[in-house]
Amino acid sequence: MGTADFIQAHTQDRINKEQALLDWLPKMGDLQCAWLLLALCATPRANHVVRALPPTHARAYAEEHDSRIWNTLQQLLCYTPTGGRGRRARGRSTLPGRLGGLGLREAQRTSPAAYWASWADALEVIRQRRPNEAAVLLADLESTEGARAQCLREVQAAADLLDREGFEQAGVGARPSWRQLFEGARPPAQEDRRETEPGEWIHGWQFYASSTRETFYREHHLMPAMSRAARATLRSQSGPQAAAWLTAVPTSPATTLSPVLFQICLRRRLRLPLLLSNRRCEGCGAPLDDLGDHRAACSVSGRLRRRAKPIELAWSAVFAEAGAVVADQVLLR
């Protein structure tokens, strides 16, 4: 809403306020805390703008927002990837955690999905409060010749884009018609939230619309440009709650990672060079690659066995909270 000058001034003010937070993050001594503020506070701030503005009006803001989020992440990683590696790492960082990314959702990609969802969520409310005006909007949206108002033309274009990218595969069937939305069609209740992640809009249609866009981008734009090893890594770190550790609050030793270890984990997820000291594996003597593939797979070094300890400690804490007496490292006789 508003003139082009008003929109530009408003979005520039938003960018300036966002930058005030982004400037502080690289100065923090705790990388895990800085990451949480970037992922859960700075990145989602774009959602209000991309829901309220048509994609063409939100484009300049979304591009600037995404660029500043990526620049801040590079500062936290103390590394600036270039060329194809940089493009792929940036693409991976914007994917939801369940699709193998870091969850720093790209506002440009979210914009059409969010704008369509805002209208999908609002049509019934408009009908209840302003039925005459709502009927005019519905007729305009259903017109085969295209809507008269630019905002309605843009939401029609967003709906067509979602259809082309496979909305029917998002888990709720075909995209609802404008009349169905007008009459109050709602997505199924998210009782099982294993598929959703912190920061996702789960109260309406945006989750399914955004999921359509993210899945299409992953399968048709990002993965075809990856090597076989990179695709395998991306798939192995995908799935419900596969990235839950990224949003763990460091309130106990079990959920806390040192800055060096946390940076290694972030780089590994983006397939960027790791902070390694040895040139050869201490187990089998093979040369170590800078992406950590050998270290993650070598069965001779004993590192695979060490993965069990954190899981044991987590279950020990659960049992202890339930009142059980838990003993660690008990010898089996």
Regions found by a protein language model. Name each.
Residues 1-333:
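Nucleic-acid-interacting cores, centered on viral/eukaryotic replication and modification enzymes
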